[in-house]
């Protein structure tokens, strides 16, 4: 199946670390679409993203990233998913089919990222011994962990969950009718 996709889509390849939440987001997207694309695992735990050829390919030194046939690199999971949906896998749509629904989905994606995913990531990076001197994803390693960010992250996530619960009291889904 992957070989067949390689023939159809050329040399596009997803570089990923399956255990990372962002990478899982792309994998869930592809699973929902019932699609596969060629993939190469990058071992983030061993710092492989900081070594060549990956370091030159993606200046953010983060996963996942998608390399297109023309060598263009797209990083950030939502950007990858949006590109794949618009260019290769339009159905079933996950980003909406009308301007109103697209805007509504974007709104909720932003809220989930800003009020949930980012605070959670910051809390983990400021708590776990694995991230000492590595609180920012990528190449910076001079920023120290701050316990206050852990507490703030927990409070922000709790508030987001309350807002989602209130929304779901009146709606069957976060966005749309299916």
For every predicted segment, state its role:
Residues 174-178:
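GST superfamily/GST-like fold recognition
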Residues 6-147:
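GST-like domain detector, emphasizing the conserved glutathione-binding G-site
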Residues 149-167:
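Amphipathic alpha-helical packing segments from all-alpha helical-bundle domains
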Residues 168-173:
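Extracellular-facing binding/remodeling surfaces
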């Amino acid at each position: 199946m992957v070989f067949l996709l390689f023939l159809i889509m050329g040399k596009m390849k997803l570089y990923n670390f399956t255990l990372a939440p962002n990478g899982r987001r792309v994998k869930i997207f592809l699973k929902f679409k019932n699609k596969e694309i060629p993939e190469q695992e990058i071992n983030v735990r061993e710092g492989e993203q900081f070594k060549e050829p990956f370091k030159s390919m993606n200046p953010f030194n983060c996963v996942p990233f998608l390399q297109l046939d023309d060598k263009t690199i797209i990083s950030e999971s939502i950007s990858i998913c949006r590109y794949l949906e618009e260019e290769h896998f339009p159905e079933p749509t996950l980003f909406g089919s009308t301007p109103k629904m697209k805007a509504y989905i974007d709104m909720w994606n932003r809220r989930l990222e800003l009020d949930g995913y980012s605070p959670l990531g910051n809390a983990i990076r400021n708590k776990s011994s694995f991230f000492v001197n590595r609180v920012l994803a990528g190449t910076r390693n001079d920023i120290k962990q701050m316990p206050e960010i852990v507490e703030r992250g927990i409070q922000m996530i709790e508030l987001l969950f309350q807002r989602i619960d209130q929304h779901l009291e009146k709606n069957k889904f976060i966005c749309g009718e299916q």
